[in-house]
Amino acid sequence: MARVTVEDCIDKVENRFELVLLASHRARLISQGASITIDRDNDKNPVVALREIADETLSPDDLKEDLIHSLQKHVEVDEPEPDPASMIAAGGVAAADSEEQDDLPETITFDQMSEEELLAGIEGLVPPEKSDDY
């Protein structure tokens, strides 16, 4: 890596550590087959990545977002929260429906379990057979 290339990049990304992270991420993308935005000139991938950052053919902010996204194992999706007024109205309707369904047999729900039911289930478990594996 030429010092001139790194010095050119410091104007675009002020923190040298962040520059190394972004350039290494871009170099990995290039080695995985991403298209380069400048002439290679027989340079290796890290130098090409630094030259892309220095020539501003890639936005450091976009690279940073891509790096963060690549490191995330679970991406949270922002879902709109339900309106409290509609939840209250839905609760009132559900209460009226439950009075009508008192004659029907009770269905088993897996979401709710009392402590006694949990303890009874645990006591009913059969311990695994001992083996010489451990």
Swiss-Prot record:
GO-annotated molecular function: DNA binding; DNA-directed RNA polymerase activity
Q: Which GO terms describe its cellular component?
A: DNA-directed RNA polymerase complex
- EC annotation from Swiss-Prot or TrEMBL: 2.7.7.6
What does the entry give for GO biological process? Answer: DNA-templated transcription
Q: Does the keyword Cell inner membrane apply?
A: no
Which UniProt key words apply to this protein?
DNA-directed RNA polymerase, Nucleotidyltransferase, Transcription, Transferase
Tell me the enzyme class: transferase
The UniProt catalytic activity note for this protein reads: RNA(n) + a ribonucleoside 5'-triphosphate = RNA(n+1) + diphosphate
| Disulfide bridges in this chain | none
Q: How does it assemble?
A: The RNAP catalytic core consists of 2 alpha, 1 beta, 1 beta' and 1 omega subunit. When a sigma factor is associated with the core the holoenzyme is formed, which can initiate transcription.
According to UniProt, the name of this protein is DNA-directed RNA polymerase subunit omega
Organism this protein belongs to = Rhizobium leguminosarum bv. trifolii (strain WSM2304)
List the gene name.
Answer: rpoZ
